[in-house]
A protein has these predicted regions:
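Active-site beta->alpha loop and helix N-cap motifs at the rims of alpha/beta catalytic domains
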Residues: 3-5, 9-13, 19-21, 27-100, ...
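Catalytic cores of large soluble enzymes that bind and process phosphate-bearing ligands
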Residues: 5-8, 39, 143, 170, ...
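Catalytic cores of alpha/beta
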Residues: 11-19, 69-73, 97, 115-125, ...
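Charge-dense, low-complexity polyampholytic segments
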Residues: 45, 190-197
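Conserved anion-binding
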Residues: 53, 57, 81, 96-97, ...
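A structured, mid-to-C-terminal "fold-capping" secondary-structure block
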Residues: 180-193, 203
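Conserved small/polar residues in nucleotide/adenosyl-binding loops
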Residues: 198-205
Length: 205
């Protein structure tokens, strides 16, 4: 299973990369804002800085929620660097955008996935990654890990190429459970990666 770090903090990305186990990065507008990075140009410069640190995929999320806006943003993001993966929300316009990007050879990460049905649509549209939100489902008394397991089983059964990128990881126990469920990738905060290194399997992040 691959490890991605879920942050826009360059120091944390460097620290995770120095461990020698980092395979990529996921970001979103909220994480960018948390680091004080605002404005399209500043965000894009920041994505390039991340790409200089990490050799793997870097998910950069579109802000638009309409199809035309997503396509425009996504094409601009993809043109920044070969490692950029365009992160698109799992809404109707998002699925259409993913299909468009697939035809153009642009890789995508379908985010905000909370059901098997959404994961199926994303895979049929050709998403590179699909991101079920484990912690957020657990927050509403649902079972995020079970969703990961069901998506993995579906993709295996129908031979979809889409990779399952488990997101909203809240503990190292979540990481262990994602491994057991067969997730291709777990994206998590630096604290979870470091606690795994320390062998603290049940610790909260």
């Amino acid at each position: 299973m691959k490890f991605f770090i879920d942050t826009a903090n360059l120091d944390q990305i460097r620290e995770a990369n120095e461990l020698g186990v980092l395979d990529g990065v996921t970001t979103n507008p909220s994480l960018m804002a948390k680091e004080g990075i605002r404005g399209v140009e500043n965000q894009r410069k920041h994505y390039l800085e991340i790409c200089e640190i990490v050799g793997g995929d870097v998910s950069a999320e579109v802000i638009a929620t309409d199809l035309e806006g997503m396509i425009k943003e996504g094409e601009e993001l993809a043109a920044l660097h070969p490692n950029i993966v365009v992160k698109v929300p799992c809404i109707e316009a998002g699925i259409k955008a993913i299909k468009y990007f697939t035809r153009k050879g642009i890789r995508t990460n379908c985010t905000l996935v909370f059901s098997v049905g959404q994961a199926l649509l994303a895979a049929k549209a050709g998403a590179t990654y699909v991101s079920p939100f484990v912690g957020r489902l657990d927050d509403i008394a649902s079972d995020g890990i079970e969703l990961v397991r069901k998506i993995v089983e579906m993709y295996d059964y129908y031979d979809y190429d889409t990779q399952v990128l488990a997101a909203s990881i809240r503990s190292t126990q979540h990481i262990i459970q994602c491994v057991e469920a067969g997730a291709d990738v777990a994206t998590c905060p630096l604290s979870a990666i470091k606690r795994s290194e320390e062998g603290r399997g049940g610790s909260e992040c």
